[in-house]
């Protein structure tokens, strides 16, 4: 006789954070016939068909994926706090330009990812740095961590608890090229290097 079964993943009611479950169904057809050489024996053949994709396969395969983001519930983005000091006269809003750039570990020039001006109180408000592990994770403007590793300004390593840790290196500097500073102002050529540590605790 012929017997058919449906196989699908049992998705838990409380889903694991960051996990995307495989929702497809595979139909299994079992055909049982008598052995032509030994009538007392039965022989079974099995075929599989992915109902969702309409594709015949040699087995039932289910593939889940995991991704995480600082934009997911419980995640935190990196706030970058910078302040400009001008000696000799009051500071005006928008007088000075500042750049936030990646800092590759090989010493090569990084890529400028943000440009901001000072406020009247001297604060420079860079946008928060947000991160995710894949394109499908939350956060349209988040930096993809695997790409940061390939670009050379991030390193990936495990911590003592087995969590994945990314260490990203950045530099903030003031635009002090000729013609970019107000009259009578001379720059103290300074840049500030900092790192951001992102820990993926396995919960998205």
Regions found by a protein language model. Give the residues of each.
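Solvent-exposed loop/turn and edge beta-strand elements of beta-rich ligand-binding domains
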Residues: 1-204
């Amino acid at each position: 006789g012929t017997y058919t079964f449906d196989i699908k993943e049992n998705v838990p009611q409380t889903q694991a954070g960051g996990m995307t479950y495989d929702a497809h169904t595979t139909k299994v057809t079992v055909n049982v016939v008598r052995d032509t050489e030994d009538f007392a024996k039965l022989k079974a053949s099995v075929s599989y068909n992915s109902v969702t994709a309409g594709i015949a396969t040699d087995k039932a395969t289910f593939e889940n994926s995991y991704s995480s983001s600082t934009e997911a519930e419980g995640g935190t983005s990196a706030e970058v706090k910078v302040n400009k000091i001008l000696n000799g006269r009051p500071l005006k809003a928008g007088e000075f330009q500042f750049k936030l750039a990646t800092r590759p570990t090989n010493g090569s020039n990084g890529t400028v990812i943000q440009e901001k001006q000072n406020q009247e109180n001297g604060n420079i408000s860079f946008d928060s740095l947000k991160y995710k592990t894949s394109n499908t994770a939350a956060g349209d403007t988040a930096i993809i961590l695997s790409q940061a590793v390939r670009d050379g300004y991030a390193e990936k390593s495990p911590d003592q608890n087995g969590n994945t840790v990314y260490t990203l290196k950045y530099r903030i500097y003031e635009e002090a090229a000729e013609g970019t500073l107000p009259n009578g102002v001379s720059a103290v050529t300074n840049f500030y290097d900092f790192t951001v540590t992102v820990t993926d605790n396995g919960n998205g």
